[in-house]
């Protein structure tokens, strides 16, 4: 990813709240979730099999090769709210220059060492199954695969860091890997790749600093007006919808992505096999109905206006609707079937 400013890009996905990172002063989210969904094909990488109280992951392979989007452009799947809000942000005078002044090489180096120094680099010779999931997801989205690190943490999370002049990388926590099936984990990686594919760049950095709220610059909160903060949060929510679409392009099954959001809302490994995607989609429709009245609309707006991510039920409804759209079906028609099936 080519970032236009010398600034870190931190993508903290699938979260509503966070805990403080001591060394950086950033808040990292407490939860991230993808849950299993029914698929017509199996997945490269890890399958999940329950043995007693434990989930044992076993290598599996796709029964059908995935579709590849060789000529895929970011605007082919970018959410219209993402397009609209990005244009509004670009129209704010001096914001890009402010980013250069605020986020310098010191911040870059701290974040780089914080992530790399405490993690395991994934490669063909290190966690090769996970490496295969990333490489395939990047191939499907027509993007160069970034580096991938696994970090020991009890907090399920995944995020992306892109630093000007350096190769971007994704970090996943060990607890997230334990929580997910291979399909879900690859969808998480695809979501993170979506941020790189769409060059979300400095806007994502600003939004994360504002929403995570712990960047140690004196009087930072007073330097940005509330209207700008609201605009950045609105953009960040729309960017997440875009990256959910990237997850669908890789999963190629909407139930995989919807079940991700269901687990985010209220799932854990011990009850994963009892979760019902169709019931969760019905719940999303009931939320729309409940918030359709004037009072419901006001409550819904108050509930979501300060969030960095859309509500899980709204994301589920959005991705379900897009999976049935002409736009998505047109992309599938343009895609080519991968010629071979890999086993990892």
Curated annotation (Swiss-Prot):
Q: Can you say where in the cell this protein is located?
A: Plastid, Chloroplast, Plastoglobule; Plastid, Chloroplast membrane
Catalytic center residues: 192
Cofactors: Zn(2+)
Kindly give the Pfam families that the UniProt entry links to this protein.
Peptidase_M48
Q: How is the protein disposed in the membrane? A: Multi-pass membrane protein
Report the co-factor binding details.
Answer: Binds 1 zinc ion per subunit.
Q: Which UniProt keywords apply?
A: Chloroplast, Hydrolase, Membrane, Metal-binding, Metalloprotease, Plastid, Protease, Transit peptide, Transmembrane, Transmembrane helix, Zinc
What EC identifiers does the entry list?
Answer: 3.4.24.-
- Membrane spanning segments where? 102-122, 169-189, 201-221, 256-272
* Signal peptide start-end: none
Describe what happens without this gene: Delayed senescence.
Q: What class of enzyme is it?
A: hydrolase
Give the CC-aspect GO terms.
chloroplast membrane; plastoglobule
UniProt GO MF annotations? metal ion binding; metalloendopeptidase activity
Q: Which domain of life is it from?
A: Eukaryota
Protein family (similarity comment):
Belongs to the peptidase M48 family. M48D subfamily.
Record's function text:
Metalloendopeptidase with a Zn-dependent proteolytic activity and substrate cleavage upstream of hydrophobic residues. Positive regulator of senescence, probably by degrading CCD4, thus participating in the controlled removal of carotenoids from the thylakoid membrane during the senescence process.
Know the name of this protein?
Plastoglobule-localized metallopeptidase 48, chloroplastic
What is the organism field in this record?
Arabidopsis thaliana (Mouse-ear cress)
Identify the gene encoding this protein.
PGM48
């Amino acid at each position: 990813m080519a970032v236009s400013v010398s600034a870190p890009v931190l993508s903290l996905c699938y979260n509503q709240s966070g805990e403080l990172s001591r060394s950086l002063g950033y808040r990292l989210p407490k939860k991230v979730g993808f849950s299993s969904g029914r698929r017509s094909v199996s997945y490269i990488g890890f399958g999940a099999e329950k043995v007693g109280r434990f989930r044992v992951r076993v290598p599996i392979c796709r029964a059908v090769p995935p579709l590849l989007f060789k000529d895929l452009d970011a605007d082919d799947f970018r959410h219209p709210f993402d397009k609209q809000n990005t244009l509004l942000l670009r129209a704010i005078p001096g914001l890009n220059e402010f980013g250069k002044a605020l986020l310098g090489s010191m911040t870059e180096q701290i974040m780089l060492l914080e992530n790399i120094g405490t993690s395991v680099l994934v490669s063909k010779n290190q966690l090769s199954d996970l490496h295969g999931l990333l490489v395939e997801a990047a191939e499907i989205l027509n993007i160069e695969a970034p580096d991938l690190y696994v970090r020991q943490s009890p907090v399920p999370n995944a995020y992306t860091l892109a630093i000007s002049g350096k190769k971007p990388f994704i970090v996943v926590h060990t607890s997230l890997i334990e929580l997910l099936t291979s399909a879900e984990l690859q969808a998480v990686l695809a979501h993170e790749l979506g941020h790189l594919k769409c060059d979300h760049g400095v806007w994502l950095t600003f939004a994360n600093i504002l929403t995570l709220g712990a960047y140690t610059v004196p009087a930072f909160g007073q330097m940005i007006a509330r209207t700008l903060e609201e605009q950045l949060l609105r953009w960040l929510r729309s960017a997440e919808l875009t990256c959910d679409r990237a997850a669908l392009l890789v999963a190629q099954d909407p139930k995989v992505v919807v079940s991700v959001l269901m687990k985010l809302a209220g799932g854990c490994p011990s009850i994963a096999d009892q979760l019902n995607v169709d019931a969760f989609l019905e719940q999303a429709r009931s939320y729309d109905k409940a918030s359709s009245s004037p009072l419901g609309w006001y409550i819904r707006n108050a509930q979501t206006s300060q969030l960095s991510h859309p509500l899980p039920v709204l994301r589920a409804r959005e991705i379900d609707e897009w999976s049935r759209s002409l736009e998505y079906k047109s992309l599938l028609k343009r895609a080519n079937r991968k010629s071979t099936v890999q086993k990892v």
